């Protein structure tokens, strides 16, 4: 006999299940603590996963002082540059000044006819953010840069000083992250049109069932005379915008100082040419997918107290 009651299929945490609007998600920067100084975000490109050797220095850990092997994700993080500076008041941009018109942007947008000088006399603002773009042409991924809005931590004076220090200069990953935790925003792998078994995890019906095995037994009652949104149906799976909180940074380095490239390069990616970032665990998206790294929104003590020394990639 069938069961009359069972939990609904699929989580309402992620709804509607449709394709992401843009490949690089935006951020609600008001939720980030402004106590942290400097830029609060950076753009990285997923290289792939690897097994890494770590020395566990976490207090009260069963493997403290020992070498362990775990999975990690490698990201290539080419430097960024500032395109424009936005002055916010009451949560709305009050003024925007374009300060960069490099040749890297010719395929992305119409470059400004001339660069503007940063108006230091403009005082009627509450917050400064910048529109930054990645110098992805230095990598083997593509040539067209990615643009995003990045907030700056600290007081108004400290934010303005940070912008002045990096006008027409490259921003390396080491200026934004050093160690600790990081939140990662990105779009997952796209699976296309999938049935309800793969999309919602429903069970197969009896093999002699009529009108199909990999489908729901009933799509709802007679009345209301419509199919409810909660009924598992076929549709889009993957290519969803997702956030992974509190990822542990294991290593930040430069290829010129420490080469971690395999002999034939990373599968589906190639060789890293610029700086790289190694994060413990897995991250969303396929190889070459752009990801937005931000300072942690809600750091936890459990993740923050974990300490590891990076030894190298496992052979």
Functional labels for PLM-detected ranges:
Residues 1-315:
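Extended basic (Lys/Arg/His-rich) segments that typically form rRNA-contacting surfaces
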